Amino acid sequence: RSARSRGTGAYEATLPAALVAQMFAVPGGLAADVADAETALVAFDAHAATRLGADHPALGPMSAVLLRTESASSSQIEDLTVGARQLALAELDESRSSNARAVVANVRTMEAALRLAAELDLEAILTMHAELLAGTEDAGRLREQLVWVGRSGLSPLGAVHIAPEAEDVPAAMQDLLAFIARDDLPVLVHAAIAHAQFETIHPFTDGNGRTGRALVHAMLSGKGLLSTTAPVSAGLLTNLGAYTTALTAFRGGDARPIVEEFARAARYAAVTGTRLVDDLAGQLAEDRERLTGVRRHALAWTVLP
């Protein structure tokens, strides 16, 4: 037998390049693309507040819908799909669907990411991961073993990506966190590169993709670009091949593709998020119209935000 068929032989784990001191020059065309995407996100954010009003009680439910849309899309990237009914039951702890429970855990991860966005340190990322894999042995813990992506679960030989050795993970994460603390890059560029580096490090035994995408939202919020969740993962989901190819290119030293993918996904998220806001506002208007003539203190009015 060959070494590959036996799953034995030499392999090379990734040693990620340090980011904290690297200078990233964003070419003019890409800078314009990113600026356009960021403008779209800001416009969506403003539209949500204007359409419903910054203090409108429906903005809370709308934020929840957007957050769940992002969480479900991020989970779907990992082949975890679930219907709305099962997701609702899982949130009430009444679903037997493992996928539904996983998506609810992703919602909790996103909630933690947004709650901790102002101070993204290692503890914050471990907390996000602990929410995602709650109840498992590895929840909220950096891995202590080698992990890889693709081919066989038994051996790293022939894998698409072999993550850094476990002993190199703490230092790689500290470098990433120092990079995240910088303030000299466009937010979307910053988040895209941080995400790709996180996926390169693969700091956990499981849940790296979902935690890494939650990290993106923590940065978009913490750095002041967004106050409402835009379903960026829904945009990534429309072209998974390009997303995974961009991550591979980043590991090879080319950051441009992953920045381009996040710019594209951000524009999609802005359009999708705006549509969701408009749909909710329209539905509320229709429901109020149906209640015309019903006295203001009737129980039916309490159902509407």
Model-derived regions, located:
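FIC/Doc superfamily catalytic core
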Residues: 1-305
